[in-house]
A protein has these predicted regions:
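Metal-centered catalytic cores of metalloenzymes
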Residues: 28-267
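Bacterial Sec-dependent N-terminal signal peptides
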Residues: 1-5, 11-48
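Residue-level detector of alpha-helical transmembrane segments in integral membrane proteins
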Residues: 6-7, 162
Length: 267
């Protein structure tokens, strides 16, 4: 009897070892092949974006700064300004202009050269009387700061000269001409009785399309509402480049407030 048990144990032990080793092998994932490694690496690169910070300035009781987010190949994804929550309190009781530079990556990949942030404490009657509430004018300029500051007041011919047909959106109408800013263009559905919480204003100078300007009221920006809207585009563009087709307003989980341009398309 003992011999039989010993004989069974002799064969049972190797069998158990084989079963244990087999089970252990099943617990390990299969090795990644060179082909799947390359494919996974490529997929990772496709989803990779880089954000570059521009100027940071004091606004109200907080700060604001510019930024650009690009793909790994340098294609612009989002360009804009971000405000800390404190920046929306302690603002001046009179109008206040600010200037912020973009990171050089933005200058290389978009037509925009600098951002002019305008705080309008009591609103203003123009364009077309729709902006009487306290708001921010966020102008993305396609010209240098020096060129912009040299824009003369009307009746100088250069500020009154309009772009050729097709170089501004067909559903925008020309409006106020302001020194150091240029000629404003507003959507043609505005009326003097319209009260605007947010929209897109465009600009021109000396026959050229020179800025895009999301306008957002203080109350809208502070509310944390999310907005993402397309805006009308010209039929033609004087210079090749990546131009945005949407403006966005939103708030993140850290209570930072954003006004940005996205959906860049090569023109």
């Amino acid at each position: 009897m003992k011999k039989k048990n010993l004989y069974a144990a002799k064969w049972l032990l190797p069998l158990c070892l084989i079963l244990i080793i087999s089970c252990q092998k099943e617990q390990y994932p299969k090795k990644e092949t060179f082909k799947t490694s390359v494919a996974n690496s490529f997929a990772d690169k496709e989803t990779k974006y880089n954000t570059f910070k521009g100027d940071e300035i004091e606004v109200g009781n907080g700060y604001a700064r510019t930024f650009i987010t690009q793909s790994h190949t340098g294609v612009p994804q989002e360009l804009g300004i971000v405000f800390t929550d404190e920046a929306l309190s302690g603002l001046p009781t009179t109008n206040a202009p600010y200037v912020l530079n973009f990171h050089h990556k933005a200058l290389e990949s978009t037509p925009f050269k600098h951002l002019a942030l305008g705080w309008s404490a009591n609103g203003h009657p123009l364009p077309v009387g729709a902006f009487i509430l306290s708001h921010f004018d966020i102008r993305f300029f396609m010209m240098s700061l020096e060129e912009r500051l040299a824009i003369p007041a009307p009746p100088a011919p250069s500020i009154l000269l309009l772009p050729p047909a097709g170089y501004m959106p067909a559903d925008y109408i020309v409006d106020a001409a302001v020194p150091q800013i240029g000629r404003h263009w507003a959507p043609n559905n505005f009326t003097s009785s319209s009260i605007i919480n947010h929209t897109m204003i465009l600009g021109s100078f000396n026959g050229n399309f020179t800025f895009v300007s999301p306008i957002v009221t203080h109350s809208t920006l502070a509310s944390g509402v999310s907005v993402s809207l397309p805006y009308s585009q010209p039929q033609y563009f004087a210079k090749h480049g990546y131009y945005p087709e949407k403006y966005n307003i939103y708030k993140d989980e850290k209570k930072r407030h954003y006004v940005t341009l996205t959906d860049f398309v090569w023109r």
